Amino acid sequence: MLKNEKKALQMFCEEDAWRDVFKEPFINEADNGRLMAAEGHIMIRVEPSLLRCKYKQGTQRLPNYDFERNDINKVIRFADIETAYNKFDLIPEKKSKDGMSDDCPECDGSGEVEYEYVDSEGHTHYKDCDCPICDGTGKRDDYELVETGRMILPKDCTFSMDGQIFDARLLWRIVEAVRLMGFDSITWLSKQFGANIFRVCDGVTVLAMSRMEQGEHHQYVELTPSTPPTP
């Protein structure tokens, strides 16, 4: 069984995602009842026999990858990732003071609202114009960020591992989630068309998309996975 099951699995999702399938874990009827939790760049699949909690039902076609293929078979220890993580120049985490988005509530961040005008002959006319509340910026004037006390990775950090480039924040999110489940490493099974498949334990697999390039202004740290000893 997985420790801290609900909390750990939710870490693979985005509660404010634009697609419902990325908001919370669900039992995927298109995957033989396995649980799926994803946010678009990372995903976890869990066999139903390992689950203790209840989840909603859903249907989502899986990407066309072979989740059983194992042609890399290298162990990635979380202690090594943490050592690499600490080499980055971290920045203070900031969050909205009131917990709300910085989007203007009148125009939902678009910067435009629709005006209606009825002329002297009774005809109605519509026109999109700058929102009068935010002056077309789409942002709140009273939005304020405050530091949480945590130090986090900036957006431009990457891990490089055997030629694959990973968004460091996403890989670290996987580490934090899988640690909550009670594990201290994952096994890298395969890389397939930009996707990387990892095994947490029997019945639990993780998918993480790699990046095409590191970018011009970035920090990166090399990770060296290890080959497990032959039984």
Language-model features and meaning:
Residues 1-231:
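DNA polymerase processivity clamps
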